[in-house]
Amino acid sequence: MARKKDVNAEIKEVANEQVKDNSYKAWNERSNEEKKASINEYSKAIIAKAIKEKATFWGKDMSKKDIDNSMPYNASKGIAYTGQTSALLRAVSELNGYEKPSFLTMKQANFLGGTLKKQLDENGKPVLTKNGKEAYEQGVKIALLKTESYVPKLDENGQTMTRAIKDQNGNQKIGKDGKPMFEIVTEKIYHKTPILETVTLYHTSQFDNLKMDKLKERDLESLEKLRDSIKKSNYDTRPNINNLGLGEKVTRDINNFLNAELKGLDYSKIQDREVTKTQTNEKEQNKSQGRGM
């Protein structure tokens, strides 16, 4: 069956081309600023693609109800995404024509029996990587600040600690090789400086064998609780995409949309209407002046 070109893969290619410093550096070796530049370029490419394809979710008025019912969400937890994450997932959903904006991490999908689909070209043939291997569907990279991590816990001799893996009855599990099973003990550590990382989200349709009956619907009740807490907050919680370096008008409109989404308000492009009204008045004035000549 013929399929259109993978939009997510195309966006990734464009973003890679736009990064000024093409010298390779492993992700873990990059500074937060270097990571941020890469992530911002990728995010910018998504919005630019949406504009090019006229898939602009911010280009139309939406009621609170319509905004709520179209919010991207995590299908494992039911939690709705807000802020820049919502903007990117909304754009990708419209670009790919996803019927329902439900997303999962790879780990969540695997836990639900899902396996990532292979990427196919416009003719339905497998897409190959530069190494000649079959490529898999591309997800959407989302930035997050990591303030803590789990690392292997060491004993007094500096050795990694382990513990027995037990079944529901408290008995130690035995592996296929007939040996007792163990797992590494971990402990939480806090980073003095938050580390910028990414998590990749995939649409539920990008997986085979996913246990659809285990997926959750969008949890609007938790969303309303979040909105209530925001009303009581003394902090400026307005989300923005100012860091992406987009045009002034696009940045303004998306920021206004995300603010309406987070606070549970209707969204309308008031400023665009004012511009249109001004242009109409100017045309009428020109016509009147023309008739008077």
Model-derived segments and spans:
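N-terminal accessory/interface modules of nucleic-acid-binding and processing proteins
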Residues: 2-292
